[in-house]
Amino acid sequence: RRDFESLEEGIDALMTDVTDKLRKIKPDIMIEFRQSYVGPSIRKYGNMFRVTDCPCDAQLNRRGIIDLRFTSGKTAVHSDMLMWNVADTKESVAYQLTSVLYGVPQISMLIDKLPKEHYRTLKHYLDFWREHREILLDGKLTAQSPESFYNQVCSCLDGEAVITVYNN
């Protein structure tokens, strides 16, 4: 005897039951899913999607964010944890940060241990992100050249746009 006719029905019942019980305990609970098992149908169970692990790889982080944004509707898309070597140039730090502008950046560095140039660069781009967050996260997203890790990305909202061009 089967409880469900298909694996999909069983998984849906399990996930629905788990998320319903968690939301009864904490109505505003954050439930995160990682990129490797995210798709449009999983949106009803979670409220946060994160790019799969790609340490120190700005291009994969950017591609992961854009891929998730295209399939995730209004669900929040978070970058993989950003990290870099403290010996890196400020330009390298900026590249990591500009590559995650269209998602929610997650910084995995000890802020108080950063070189001053890195701290200023981080502050600059996080200030930019905060100022333009609505456009970046809620705007109509377009991107070119997935084979080049989306080297041109644009988000438009209410007559304003943020456009980035990356030289991979």
Where are these regions (language model features)?
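Active-site-proximal substrate-binding groove within the catalytic cores of carbohydrate-active enzymes
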Residues: 14-168
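The substrate-binding groove and active-site-proximal loops of carbohydrate-active enzymes
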Residues: 1-12, 84
